[in-house]
Swiss-Prot record:
Key words, A-Z: DNA-binding, Isomerase, Magnesium, Metal-binding, Repeat, Topoisomerase, Zinc, Zinc-finger
Active-site residues, Swiss-Prot/TrEMBL: Y298 (o-(5'-phospho-dna)-tyrosine intermediate)
EC number: 5.6.2.1
Keyword Chaperone in record: no
Protein's UniProt name: DNA topoisomerase 1
MF terms (GO), sorted A to Z: DNA binding; DNA topoisomerase type I (single strand cut, ATP-independent) activity; zinc ion binding
Length: 700
């Protein structure tokens, strides 16, 4: 008896769906894209202004395609069940092509969640493949190939090898570089504050002096600050006014991709890549108290829509578990402000409210539980009543100055019951107008304005979203590309551009301004949305981009000056005798042998005076530790740097491959004879054997 064949992307998804269906169905995974543009060539044929992608079955999918063809041939019906977004639609298209079926006749089934009811409903309501969505994805893929294949080699030729450029990544990189320029150009401004504490421990803010309003940056002159301080020393203060306001704090909307990534970063410390990997697992299926199922809806979405049934279930759950006060009279409805949002999709929510975080703790690992709990509570919160807070401002004055004491308390916690930043209440005493207050402490303090902060990964995602750059599926990969290409390093959650990031951005700004222009990139994203909606032609879009872009590429070959000039040091390489020179790398300048790649000798370039030229021995000594290499007993242990930070290696590299994260000492372990390394801890500096783990205090 013939079976129905369902083809999905991932094995995990296939396994979960297979558990829901009977013996009449077989579910198999394509394991992602089975066709793509070739890696070894441009892969786009241009004939009579038509752009024809030359797709190939990827080498790691050859055997799988044979299996799919065989199973499809014998199947009663073949269902394409890839994700419901452009990428999923394109994967379905390529599957149909690869197995030799007409993409217009195969039934396409879609669902927002992987639950039994959702799959059964999808099978009852198949549709045709949406070729407009496929063409939007093809346009994006071809645009990325054009930019990457034509522009990246030019950057490699003019700046350094291994560089890349892309529509979204280059625009994102410019945002990071521009922020770094702001920070470097920032000039701090000194300002002063008059800080008052009234009895008992009541912090007060100066808001008025001689009838003039005082704000944060009002007092920038020290003499004036002293004058105001003197006026504040009058110890007779009385309450002149009391303001009290109630405020409703509306619950936040449910998560979409960008806000999930931001909240997971801020609350859980997860980077976007980690968030999406965990969310994918939760979507595709995990063990639950009711068997294997997807426990959240599709995680790549820019929609805030919620299924009517899901909202009704949430309202029942809220009333049953929290009471009627926590349930608004009508369901809360949210609409997205994101450019190009696909409203047919759903927001990210739990698929089964009975799978509570308490029950989930028995089935999910630590990080899965954290993210699931965040999604679960946010969904419940979005359908709960607002929180109500009361703010109180008490104004205290003498003859010349007015201070403000602020207080706050939560009158009703509302959605804060499950989700929210519950700041500690600052409840003020019962004051009366005319009441006198005594000064507990009064002082003048100096401050300096601070430069704008660098973007965090979550902050960059928020910025990209606000500018309409990229879509839910591209945020995490964009950051991964920037870090893997060494354009950006992440230090204490801050994105820091490298020297080469400045060089590349400068070249692109001068010669390919469209590529780094956020408005152009956003408009192109909007055009892709229009293609998906059949409001724009994909071939025309490619044509309008390609020809002006290629003219700039040709101009750039002669117009862009090479930055690969080297400064010879007049020194001989200690390894091969060749000439040493200063080269530019991803992390700045360094010394290298001109016989590269035959000779791999290199070292750090220490900051030197422009009028000072040091000889080779002096420079080598600057990196040296004076400790003999414990491995070869010939070389010297030297301090080196990589993109992961400082490490210690042998000066005889590459002949000696000794490497250590910690600085080796001259002492040996009494137990095994291994070299002890120096570890600096909060408790002090110790010597430790990495083999025996024996520690001993380091003597001065």
């Amino acid at each position: 008896m013939k079976k129905n064949l369902i083809i999905v992307e991932s094995p995990a998804k296939a396994k979960t769906i297979g558990n829901f269906l009977g013996k009449d169905y077989e579910v198999i995974a394509s394991k992602g894209h089975i066709r793509d543009l070739p890696k070894s060539s441009f892969g786009i044929k241009i004939e009579d202004d038509e752009f024809i992608p030359e797709y190939r079955i990827t080498s790691d999918h050859s055997a799988l395609v044979k299996e799919l063809k065989s199973k499809a041939k014998d199947a009663k019906e073949v269902y394409l069940a890839t994700d419901e977004d452009r990428e999923g639609e394109a994967i379905a298209y390529h599957i149909a092509k690869a197995i030799g079926k007409d993409e217009n006749t195969l039934p396409r089934i879609v669902f927002h969640e992987i639950t039994k009811s959702a799959i059964e409903n999808a099978l009852k309501n198949p549709r045709k493949l949406n070729m407009h969505s496929v063409n939007a994805q093809q346009t994006r893929r071809l645009l990325d190939r054009i930019v990457g294949y034509k522009l990246s080699p030019l950057l490699g030729q003019k700046i350094q090898r291994g560089l890349s450029a892309g529509r979204v990544q280059s625009a994102a990189l410019k945002i990071i570089v521009d922020r770094e320029k702001e920070i470097r150009a920032f000039v701090p401004l000194e300002y002063f504050s008059i800080d008052m504490i009234f009895q008992k421990d009541l912090d007060a803010e100066l808001v008025e002096f001689d009838k003039a309003k005082i704000e944060k940056l009002t007092i920038t002159n020290k003499d004036r600050a002293k004058l105001i301080l003197e006026a504040c020393k009058n110890e007779v203060y009385s309450i002149s006014d009391i303001e009290s306001k109630e405020r409703k704090i509306a619950p936040p909307p449910p998560f979409m991709t960008s806000t999930l990534q931001q909240s997971a970063s801020n609350r859980l410390g997860f980077n976007p890549k980690k968030t999406m990997m965990i969310a994918q697992k939760l979507y595709e299926g995990v063990n639950t108290h009711e068997g294997v199922m997807g426990v959240i809806t599709y995680m790549r979405t820019d929609s805030l829509n919620l299924a009517k049934e899901a909202v009704e279930n949430a309202r029942k759950f809220i009333q049953a578990n929290f009471g009627k006060d926590y349930l608004p009279s009508k369901a809360n409805v949210y609409t997205t402000k994101t450019k190009g949002a696909q409203e047919a999709h759903e927001a990210i929510r739990p698929t089964n409210l009975s799978f509570t975080p308490e029950i989930a703790a028995k089935f999910l690992d630590k990080d899965e539980l954290k993210l699931y709990t965040l999604i679960y509570n946010r969904f419940l919160a979005c359908q709960m009543s607002p929180a109500i807070s009361q703010t109180q401002n008490v104004f205290v004055k003498n003859d010349r100055v007015v201070f403000k004491i602020s207080g706050r308390k939560i009158l009703f916690d509302g959605y804060y019951k499950v989700y929210g930043d519950m700041d500690k209440d600052k409840i003020l005493p019962n004051f009366k107008i005319g009441q006198n207050l005594k000064v507990q402490n009064l002082e003048m303090n100096s401050h300096f304005t601070e430069p704008p902060s660098r973007y965090s990964e979550a902050g960059l995602v928020k910025k990209l979203e606000s500018l309409g750059i990229g879509r839910p599926s591209t945020y995490a990969p964009t950051i991964s590309i920037l870090t893997s290409r060494d354009y950006v390093t992440i230090d204490k959650k801050q994105l820091i551009p490298s020297d080469v990031a400045f060089n590349v951005t400068e070249v692109l700004e001068k010669n390919f301004s469209d590529i780094v222009d956020s408005k152009f990139t956003s408009n192109l994203e909007n055009t892709l949305d229009e293609i998906a909606e059949d409001k724009a032609d994909w071939q025309e879009t490619l044509k309008e981009f390609y020809y002006p872009f290629m003219r700039k590429i040709e101009e750039g070959k002669t117009k862009i000056a090479s930055q690969k000039t080297v400064t010879k040091l007049g020194e001989s390489c200690p390894d091969c005798g060749g000439e040493l020179a200063i080269r530019k790398g991803r992390f700045g300048e360094f010394v290298a042998c001109l016989n590269f790649p035959k000779c791999k000798y290199s070292r750090n370039l220490k900051s030197e005076s422009k009028n000072e030229s040091e000889n080779t021995a002096a420079k080598a000594k600057a990196n040296g530790t004076g400790i003999t290499c414990p491995s070869c007993q010939k070389g010297e242990i030297v301090e080196r740097f990589s993109k992961r930070g400082k490490f210690y290696g042998c000066s005889a590299y590459p002949k000696c491959n000794f490497i250590s994260k910690y600085k080796p000492s001259e002492e040996k372990c009494e137990e095994c004879g291994e070299t002890l390394v120096i570890k600096e801890l909060k408790k002090g500096t110790f010597l430790e054997c990495l083999k025996c783990k024996i520690k001993k205090e380091m003597k001065d």
